[in-house]
Curated annotation (Swiss-Prot):
Name of this chain's protein: DNA primase
Residue ranges occupied by any Toprim domain in the UniProt entry: 250-332
Enzyme Commission number(s) of this protein: 2.7.7.101
Binding, Mg(2+) 1: 256, 300
GO cellular component, one term: DNA-directed RNA polymerase complex
Stored Gene3D superfamilies: 3.40.1360.10, DNA primase, catalytic core, N-terminal domain (3.90.980.10), Zinc finger, CHC2-type domain (3.90.580.10)
Species whose genome carries this gene: Rickettsia conorii (strain ATCC VR-613 / Malish 7)
Entry binding sites for Mg(2+) 2: 300, 302
Reaction(s) catalysed (UniProt annotation): ssDNA + n NTP = ssDNA/pppN(pN)n-1 hybrid + (n-1) diphosphate
Family: Belongs to the DnaG primase family.
Cofactor: binding details: Binds 1 zinc ion per monomer. Binds two Mg(2+) per subunit.
GO biological-process terms attached to the record: DNA replication, synthesis of primer
Domain of life: Bacteria
Domain commentary: Contains an N-terminal zinc-binding domain, a central core domain that contains the primase activity, and a C-terminal DnaB-binding domain.
Length: 595
């Protein structure tokens, strides 16, 4: 009885793999997964792990790995299809009958798979010493040639004769994606004079080929056309080998080419896969995330690689969250992954993995590095582009984190760096001379920004008194606060006249910094028409109170010989209370203002 591959996925989702495994293995819960003694080899220390969330098992000892169907197959000795049927019967799951059209489809698929397997056997027999020498020159060992079933498609008619002798006609070869048709109607071997690299699906079945031209010729690389069994948007080169390693290491490495995958596998990075001459798709990302929580992209550093990175970033942003991540390896100029590992060794590439950057860091690198931001228009365009990236993130918490990250980068790389040279003798110098800001200093800036942007808030006597009596750590800001209240607010200066007045004073740099539309000291945009000043003030006031509470708590702990535990407890209780209130305000205000 044949079942559709879609039913395999249904079983993986329906049946907890741990429920099936514990019928044969005593499992113990550990770090969200299960561990036990491997049923496939003798061991005294448990190295067999099972993950319900990833629907996967893996043995660190014998390397056995797979899904719930594969486990049943390994235990029972049944085929994969037979194991799926057994699981369905055991769990009372109805097996959908194939329609006549489905039967025809799967019969054709089986025939194509058989033809592709035959083609690969033929290509393997055509390897010559010259081709093996070429592969060895590329750093590929004879063992790796065998492991990846690398072959060669000759120019002569041996290919056609091979299949003719097996009574396989041109039509069937066409359905398998093995032949092409010239404009004059001539039929030819699609991979003629090319090194052949079989492409296998997750079940280790050959579904197509990649071909690398021998010598000069275009295109240099060629893939099988899409067929009944081969869809580029679904398939990743090397996935049949990589999935178990990805599960073990909790990450995958995604590269561009076949030889990148082969070189990295040979060097020990068996979690590597490649997209097949097409852009990365959502299907690719979800497939890799099922095996590991992080996808590490390692693309060429040229313009094409940067463009591919941008496409992948835009695709991934709506899909990522705090658990499912994307990161990037930045290769040295002129190197692709194949070169990186063959010329510099496995240790060099391992260090590149260790130095990988996050998706947010890659966005900043793409938008900032090597560009000029001298004009207001250039800076505005940078902020516009960064906000556009943030807007694509579906996870609200992550969206806020990205927004804050970019705000911090703008501050560190644009404001601080560009103003240092021109403000050594101004009141801004004490602000930007520090390498970082304490939370209290950031709040001082925020209070002053509020004063500049929303003077209407001073109509509330309590708020005016608070700001007026605030004792600033940064004395330059305190002087600005005093001057601004006395000269601008108390004299009811019109908004249109303020800049001209401040420009004549030593406070102009501070004024420019604080009056930016997008305030650098808060995760908000002041150009929002619907900004809630009441919530903003509550947030600032509570944050200020919390910081002072924490400082008093620290002083109490450090200065009391025999701690006044009752006092300490009161501080802890109040700190927790205010922190919770701030969290509520964060959700109702900060998230609201960046959407």
């Amino acid at each position: 009885m044949r079942v559709a591959p879609e039913f395999y996925e249904f079983l993986r989702n329906r049946i907890n793999i741990s429920d099936v495994v514990r019928q044969k293995v005593a499992l113990t819960r550990k770090s969200g997964n299960y561990v036990g003694l491997c049923p496939f080899h003798q061991e005294k220390t448990p190295s067999f792990t099972v993950s319900n969330s990833k629907r996967f098992f893996y043995c660190f000892g014998c390397k056995a790995a797979g899904d719930v169907i594969k486990f049943t197959s390994n235990i029972s000795g049944l085929s994969y299809n037979e194991s799926a049927i057994k699981l369905a019967i055991d769990y009372g799951i109805e097996i959908p009958k194939l329609t006549a059209k489905q039967k025809e489809f799967y019969e054709e698929s089986d025939e194509i798979l058989n033809i592709l397997e035959l083609a690969n056997k033929f290509f393997r027999t055509q390897l010559t010493p010259e081709i093996l020498h070429y592969l060895h020159e590329r750093g590929i060992t004879e063992e790796t040639v065998k492991e990846f079933s690398i072959g060669f498609a000759p120019k002569n008619n041996k290919f056609e004769k091979f299949f003719h002798d097996k009574n396989i006609d041109i039509i069937k070869l066409g359905k398998a994606g093995l032949i092409g048709k010239r404009e004059n109607g001539e039929i030819y071997n699609l991979f003629s004079n090319r090194i052949t690299i079989p492409i296998r699906n997750i079940y280790n079945k050959i579904v197509g080929f990649g071909g690398r031209v021998l010598g000069e010729g275009l295109p240099k690389y060629l893939n099988s056309p899409e067929t009944t069994v081969f869809q580029k948007s679904e398939t990743l080169y090397g996935e049949h080998k990589a999935i178990s390693s990805s599960y073990k290491k909790n990450h995958s490495i995604l590269v561009e080419g076949y030889f990148d995958v082969i070189a990295l596998h040979q060097a020990g990075f068996s979690e590597t896969v490649a997209s097949l001459g097409t852009s990365v798709t959502e299907n690719h990302l979800h497939k890799l995330w099922r095996a590991g929580d992080e996808i590490i992209l390692c693309l060429d550093g040229d313009n094409a690689g940067i463009k591919a990175s941008i496409r992948t970033i835009n695709l991934a942003l709506p899909l990522i969250n705090s658990e499912k991540k994307i990161s990037f390896i930045r290769l040295p100029s002129g190197l692709d992954p194949d070169d990186a590992v063959n010329k510099n060794g496995a240790d060099f590439f391992a260090k590149l993995i260790d130095k990988r950057i996050s998706l947010s860091e890659m966005i900043w690198h793409i938008e900032y590095s090597g560009k000029s931001f001298k004009t207001a228009e250039e800076k505005a365009n940078l902020e516009k582009n960064l906000k556009n990236y943030c807007s694509k993130i579906s996870d609200s918490d992550l969206k806020v984190s990205y927004y804050r990250f970019f705000k911090d980068q703008i501050w560190q790389n644009l404001v601080t760096t560009q103003k240092k040279a021109t403000t050594k003798n101004s009141n801004l110098a004490p602000i930007i001379s520090s390498h970082g800001y304490s939370e209290l200093e950031i709040l001082e800036h925020a209070f002053c920004a509020l004063l500049v942007k929303f003077p209407i808030i001073l109509e509330e006597k309590d708020i005016r008194d608070f700001i007026l009596n605030l004792n600033f750590n940064n004395k330059s800001l305190e002087e600005f606060r005093n001057w601004y209240l006395n000269e601008i607010i108390d004299n009811n200066v019109e908004a249109s006249e303020i800049t001209a007045i401040v420009e004549k004073t030593s406070f102009f740099d501070i004024f420019l910094l604080l009056s930016k539309t997008d305030n650098l000291f808060l995760d908000i945009s002041f150009n929002k028409n619907n900004i809630r000043l009441d919530l903003l003030w509550q947030w600032l006031h509570k944050k200020y109170y919390l910081i002072n509470l924490q400082q008093e708590y620290a002083i109490t702990i450090n200065s009391t010989d025999n701690h006044d535990f009752e006092k300490v407890l009161l501080y802890k209780k109040e700190i927790l209370k205010i922190a919770n209130e701030l969290q509520v305000l964060n959700e109702s205000f900060i998230n609201h203002t960046i959407t």
